[in-house]
């Protein structure tokens, strides 16, 4: 939920107008809108490149994942990992656009906990996968844009580590 929605719902629940501080938060949200849109555009336009680079880096760091018995061993399992990479990159993009980590939590982490536990996927490996996704993504952004985007990746990584 964006800051705008949060402010409106809270003010309405309390039967009042938004406070000066709340209006400043909305102003700040709008001021960063162009930057958030630019970041989202780069991430979405570069999805294939990001996923390819991140997966290559992950397989180099963790060859056991693609070795016999590994969770990404075989064409089908590897394709599922790449699909998940794209899904997580999309979640990061949602968070950046919203200026809020809530979409990552509600859409991504809550469902991931259940899914990966039921499939027996080791979550430390998923955290490492998201780290490589972060590295590949931030390399395509300006320094200022990378600074804005990084906390969304970090939130997802931390969520994977604490599941």
Curated annotation (Swiss-Prot):
Residues holding (2R,3E)-phycocyanobilin: 81
Gene Ontology biological-process annotations: photosynthesis
PTM notes: Contains one covalently linked bilin chromophore.
Subcellular localization, as worded in the UniProt entry: Cellular thylakoid membrane
Membrane topology type: Peripheral membrane protein
UniProt KW Secreted keyword: no
Key words of the record: Antenna complex, Bile pigment, Chromophore, Electron transport, Membrane, Methylation, Photosynthesis, Phycobilisome, Thylakoid, Transport
Pfam families, per the entry: Phycobilisome (PF00502)
GO cellular component: phycobilisome; plasma membrane-derived thylakoid membrane
Quaternary data: Heterodimer of an alpha and a beta chain.
Known role: Light-harvesting photosynthetic bile pigment-protein from the phycobiliprotein complex. Allophycocyanin has a maximum absorption at approximately 650 nanometers.
Similarity comment text for this entry: Belongs to the phycobiliprotein family.
Protein name as annotated: Allophycocyanin alpha-B chain
Species of the source: Synechococcus sp. (strain ATCC 27144 / PCC 6301 / SAUG 1402/1) (Anacystis nidulans)
